[in-house]
UniProtKB/Swiss-Prot annotation:
Feature: compositional bias, Low complexity: 23-34
Biased composition (Basic and acidic residues): 1-12
GO molecular function annotation: DNA binding; transposase activity
The species this protein was found in: Streptomyces fradiae (Streptomyces roseoflavus)
Protein name in the entry: Transposase for transposon Tn4556
Pfam families xref list: DDE_Tnp_Tn3
Length: 892
């Protein structure tokens, strides 16, 4: 197959340069857990005991269980926590010593050999549930189970932790390099530069004054009256110095020159030299963990990353030596100012290099290549090789027909691309023909496209009256009652099942679940929801929290709410569920966490995280993802779309400008979505064409980019395999997008996908120009999401709205609770607003359909979210509470 640049090039499977493993393989050929997990009593669906285990696997398990002291779940003498507690706790602080401890933890867990046990026959969901129970459950609860059940939980937990510990270590390495090394060195360098600025200014002024004298006294100057050229004012060097010293004494001039040599970089330097020089002084941060890094993490690389990986593996041999020669390093990696710092530092002896500077040069390259997946970890799930996960060979051939049919994509590109090119050409001509009559489109002197601002949609008196009447009729309730009532309508509480799978359902479990949702969703903790009744006692809350509330059960409950929201006539008036938007909501994380990132604009001096969530045009939240810091939304949009909790598959996707890139445009279009980002920087957007000679009238200058159809066609099979792998869930879109770019530039395959995306991007811009209604539809959907985020802020009011979670799992769980409370409150509002509209119609009120479509389900004046909470649902004989008199006062 031709044109496989970026995927395969004969360097091993999927184009990967293979290296020998540096992690113990464990028992070779470990048998699977029984031929049939269900029949053998294994970890199949609904089973709580392990299946028969092959002898090599059994030996490995018992070594881990007994030899390591984990199986007793007890606290060793003199210790505060059990061995299990110690090993399942990941790093939280970002520092060199923490990095060393994270690698030691990964090494210790890998030594159990559980990574070699074949668990392929165990249902992944069951394995995930057991490992989650083992990671989060209290040791006292785990001790209550039988030996077989504890062994199964231990094995699932250790298998999970084997790769998770490496994930945690590399997460910490990434944030350590980015924030504590590179960013801190840049900040300190900038401070030093600012501090030295007055000296530089004074020295520069003296030099400028002196050289002005030189020019004035030595340059030829024409007499404008006579045209003659008089002789220079000075005829000797002594005379010139005499003239200079009249304005700047010689000793001050010498001091100014010395100051500039001290405070400014050499001419052949670059802008990075100052902070890189400061970075070298922080070698003590990386010294403790460098040797562990290359021995614990089983690194591998693509051909492009092989040189960096080789340099990384050589670093332990250089550390601590007094003299390292140029032949012992890879000089090709010394880009920019690194060459001077490594090879020509003032303190170096002839024939030696600065190996500390070289170490940081390699780490800077490693950081970049880890993020682009050109260097990866074979014993990690998050930092592994996405190319190895792509559908290939027989697996791709089997999936290919189904993928192409599902996405409506052809196996051959020529006809499809010709049709797309014809559509683009025709749209250009149609819109260009309407430009003279359009007041919406404006071109500046450079031919750049501008839109006239959308006028605010007027709110007629009928809408204001309807909104006031409906809002006045909504019953006044406390948030716990909302949750209990929604549970009674939907049965969403039934989605919360015990992770042990064998536990009898607790009495009044719905009350406990509602209390926990308030505790987490309102960010207030247990204290305000605790009570004397059994469902609200601390022990019950803690037990249910650990065994019933987890990401999988939040998602299952949310799917039920989404389904019920779609069935309400009022929600159907708002939309058909086929338009969705994706946007981020920011949370300050004030506690130390590897999974928080700094951003002064959003988080001040703290770290933070972003909840990237999706909402459809029926106001239902379809799911979301918690990511560290404030990364570009475009990296995660596809993953959020494919990992939704429930509801119809959206067809049109609205995002803000931060979610836009040509590659993302291409991937979303290939995946069957109509991508509609808001383009705040529209005049700077390049429009694209296929036919360079076509005359597109007013768009002639704006359409200055050319789409290369031949490039797309050359890579078509790989493009199909990429989107097929994303569509089937074989690989995360985030990893693919990272893989398709290197150093900010697309790979050949990424460039082909970007060219495909430029067709859709240009069609989107043309539609924005031609259809004000399309622009308004995008704006309405974006405003809908902003309204949801505003309501979320009101709900998540405790602890100043800050997220006190150290680990990503905890963040996802708490934000999962917030998302579920949001959807429950929106469902409550929608159903009662629908009833209010029906009542108003029955009473003869002037209710217009266009006004009903503009009602918002994010009203909150009638919901009490503060104080201590009551979890007793009143009798509702009619199924719903009585609507309030629309003329009643607003007192709750």
């Amino acid at each position: 197959m031709g044109g496989r640049a970026g995927l395969d090039d004969g360097r091993g499977a999927e184009g990967v340069v293979r290296r020998g493993s540096r992690v113990a393989e464990g028992a070779a050929g470990a048998a699977a857990w029984g031929d049939d997990a269900d029949e053998a009593g294994g970890l199949g669906a609904g089973s709580s005991e392990p299946a028969a285990v092959g002898q090599p696997a059994r030996d490995a398990e018992h070594r881990a269980a007994s030899g390591a002291g984990l199986f007793g779940w007890t606290v060793p003498p003199g210790e505060r926590v059990s061995e299990l507690d110690r090993l399942r706790r990941g790093p939280v602080r970002v520092s060199g010593p923490q990095m060393k401890r994270a690698l030691e933890r990964a090494e210790e867990i890998a030594a159990f050999g559980m990574g070699a046990v074949d668990v392929s026959r165990i249902p992944p969901r069951r394995l995930a549930e057991l490992s989650r129970y083992g990671v989060d459950g209290k040791a006292s609860l785990l001790r209550r189970h039988s030996d077989a059940r504890r062994l199964a939980t231990l094995l699932a937990t250790t298998v999970y932790l084997t790769s998770r510990a490496v994930d945690d270590a590399l997460d910490l390495l990434e944030v350590l390099i980015a924030t504590k090394l590179l960013a801190r060195a840049e900040r300190e360098s900038a401070k030093e530069k600012l501090k030295s600025l007055p000296r530089v200014e004074r020295a520069s002024a003296k030099l400028a004054t002196a050289f002005q004298v030189v020019f004035d006294t030595t340059s030829e100057q024409v007499d404008t009256d006579t045209g003659e050229i008089p002789p220079p004012k000075v005829e000797s060097l002594e005379g010139m110095w005499a003239a200079i010293e009249q304005v700047v004494p010689r000793h001050e001039l010498a001091a100014a020159i010395a100051a500039l040599f001290e405070l400014t970089p050499p001419l052949d330097s670059d802008a990075d030299e100052a902070w890189r020089a400061m970075l070298i002084n922080r070698f003590g941060t990386v010294r403790p963990f460098l040797k562990l890094l290359v021995s614990v993490v089983d690194f591998d690389a693509t051909p492009e990353g092989e040189a960096v990986l080789g340099a990384l593996l050589s670093l332990p041999e250089l550390m601590g030596r007094k003299k390292v020669g140029p032949a012992e390093i890879d000089a090709d990696l010394l880009t920019g100012s690194w060459r001077r710092l490594v090879l020509a530092a003032p303190h170096l002896e002839p024939g030696t290099v600065d190996w500390k500077a070289y170490t940081f040069c390699v780490l800077e390259h490693l950081h970049r290549m880890l993020r682009s997946k050109q260097v990866f970890a074979k014993n990690s799930s998050k930092w592994g090789d996405p190319r190895a996960k792509l559908l290939a060979g027989q697996a791709w051939q089997q999936a290919r027909p189904t993928v192409l049919a599902s996405l409506n994509l052809p196996g051959e590109a020529d006809g499809h691309l010709a049709a797309r090119a014809a559509l683009l050409d025709g749209t250009y001509r149609e819109v260009a023909a309407r430009v003279p009559d359009s007041a919406q489109i404006v071109f500046d002197d450079d031919g750049r496209l501008h839109f006239a601002a959308l006028e605010p949609e007027p709110e007629p008196a009928s809408l204001l009256e309807l909104r006031a009447a409906v809002n006045a009729m909504l019953p006044r309730v406390d948030l716990p009652e909302v949750l209990l009532e929604v549970f009674s309508w939907t049965g969403a509480d039934q989605a919360f099942t015990s992770v042990t799978a064998g536990e009898a359902r607790l009495k009044d479990l719905n009350v406990t679940i509602a209390a926990l949702l308030v505790a987490h969703g309102c960010n207030v903790g247990y204290t305000p929801v605790m009570g004397g009744a059994d469902p609200l006692k601390y022990g019950r809350l803690s037990h249910v929290d650990q065994t019933y509330l987890r990401l999988a059960t939040y998602r299952a409950a949310n799917a039920t709410l989404i389904e019920h929201q779609a069935s309400i006539p009022l929600a159907q008036t708002w939309g058909g569920g086929l338009v969705a938007s994706v946007d981020g909501m920011r949370f300050v994380v004030p506690v130390p966490s590897v999974y928080a990132r700094p951003n002064p604009k959003y988080f001040g001096r703290r770290g933070g995280a972003t909840w990237l969530n999706m909402i459809n045009d029926q106001a239902a939240g379809l799911g979301g993802k918690v990511v560290a810091g404030t990364p570009r939304d475009s990296l995660y949009v596809l993953d959020v779309l494919y990992d939704r909790d429930g509801g119809k598959r959206p067809e049109m996707i609205v995002t803000d400008t931060a979610s836009y890139s040509d590659i993302v445009f291409g991937l979303l279009t290939l995946a069957g979505f109509a991508y509609a980002p808001q383009l705040a920087d529209l005049p700077d957007q390049k429009m694209w064409r296929v036919d360079r000679t076509a005359d597109y009238g007013a768009f002639q200058d704006a359409a200055r980019g050319r789409i290369d159809l031949a490039r797309i066609e050359r890579h078509w099979e790989d493009i199909l395999r990429i989107i097929g792998s994303i569509h089937t869930g074989a690989v995360r879109a985030y990893d693919v997008i990272r893989m398709l770019s290197r150093d900010g530039r697309p790979t050949p395959l990424g460039d082909a996908i970007a060219h495909y995306g430029r067709i859709a991007k240009t069609l989107h811009i043309l539609r924005l120009a031609d259809e004000p209604g399309y622009r308004r539809q995008i704006k309405v959907q974006a405003n809908l999401q902003e309204g949801r985020h505003a309501l979320a802020r009101k709900i998540f009011h405790g602890k100043q709205g800050q997220l006190y979670q150290r680990y990503q799992d905890g963040m996802e769980d708490q934000i999962g609770a917030l998302g579920l409370v949001l959807n429950a409150l929106v469902l409550f509002n929608t159903r009662y607003m629908d009833a209010a509209v029906n009542q108003l119609r029955a009473d003869g009120f002037d209710v217009r359909d266009e006004d009903v479509a503009r009602l918002s389900p994010f009203v909150r004046h009638h919901i009490n979210m503060l104080g201590r909470y009551s979890f007793q649902l009143p009798d509702l004989p009619g199924g719903l509470r009585p609507l309030r008199d629309k003329t009643a006062t607003d007192d709750m």
